[in-house]
């Protein structure tokens, strides 16, 4: 099955490059303050970043002592940008879908993934591979769009006739699978799965859950127009798990 790669489409990539997180990096990501506190010690570690995008997390790991980092992404455009912004002798970038990554068993200390797993159809297959790649005691830290956010599919508020927000729709929650949604004005394929599926898949494949967080906007951002509405429903789910 051909995997969707919207980020190599020029129009979509141009729109993505204008996003705050694309321009400001980790500090421009609303969840970063929370996610950073979930990260393990990187000193002398072998690190894998699945869906590395511009390479922000790759560079962070190296800056915090990682011995080597492999950043993978399906998008050649993303990796070209990563090499421009975050080239480092300790970072290797590879253009490959995360489901097709091939690594020797028990060779990775830390695996990171930021807002990428919801593009993967076969989540359990990926987690099985991650469990194989990680050394005993190795750590997986990832963020995904929250199941409440992905369930109904439109990923948009319901508005009244005056254009005021009424509520956020949650529907078809237990019907997992493909969702066609709008992102940056384009139709994008994502995959919805329940909170139970995310967490139990980890537990059933040799992981111990260490942290599960639904991040809220930092207090200092709540005065930004529209930001208070982000307190009405979770958008992201952050998980840290350790291979037993």
Set out the residue ranges of the language-model regions.
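A short glycine-rich, Lys/Arg-flanked "PGG" loop and its adjoining helix->strand segment in the class I
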Residues: 124-139
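Short alpha-helix
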Residues: 189-212
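A short SAM/SAH-binding and catalytic strip from SAM-dependent methyltransferases
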Residues: 109-124
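Class I SAM-dependent methyltransferase SAM/SAH-binding core
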Residues: 48-50, 54-100
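Conserved class I S-adenosyl-L-methionine
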Residues: 1-42, 56-60, 81, 140-177
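A short acidic, Gly/Pro-enriched loop at the edge of an enzyme's catalytic core
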Residues: 99-111
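Core SAM-dependent methyltransferase catalytic element
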Residues: 205-207, 225-244
């Amino acid at each position: 099955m051909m995997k969707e790669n919207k980020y190599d489409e020029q129009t979509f990539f141009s729109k993505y490059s204008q996003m705050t997180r694309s321009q400001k990096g980790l500090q421009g990501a609303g969840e970063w303050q929370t996610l950073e506190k979930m990260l393990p010690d990187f000193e002398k570690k072998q690190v894998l970043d699945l869906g590395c995008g511009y390479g922000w997390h790759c560079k962070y790991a190296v800056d915090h002592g990682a011995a080597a980092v492999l950043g993978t992404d399906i998008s050649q455009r993303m990796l070209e940008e990563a090499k421009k912004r975050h080239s480092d002798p300790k970072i290797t970038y590879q253009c490959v879908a995360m489901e097709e990554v091939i690594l020797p068993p028990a060779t990775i200390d830390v695996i990171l993934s930021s807002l990428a797993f919801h593009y993967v159809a076969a989540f359990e297959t990926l987690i099985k591979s991650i469990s194989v790649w990680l050394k005993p005691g190795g750590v997986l830290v990832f963020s995904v769009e929250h199941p409440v956010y992905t369930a109904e599919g439109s990923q948009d508020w319901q508005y009244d006739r005056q254009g005021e927000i009424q509520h956020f729709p949650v529907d078809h929650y237990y019907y997992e699978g493909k969702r066609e949604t709008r992102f940056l004005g384009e139709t994008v394929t994502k995959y919805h799965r329940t909170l139970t599926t995310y967490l139990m898949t980890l537990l059933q494949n040799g992981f111990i859950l260490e942290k599960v967080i639904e991040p809220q906007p930092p207090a200092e951002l709540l005065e930004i127009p529209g930001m208070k509405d982000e307190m009405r429903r979770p958008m992201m789910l952050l998980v840290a798990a350790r291979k037993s």
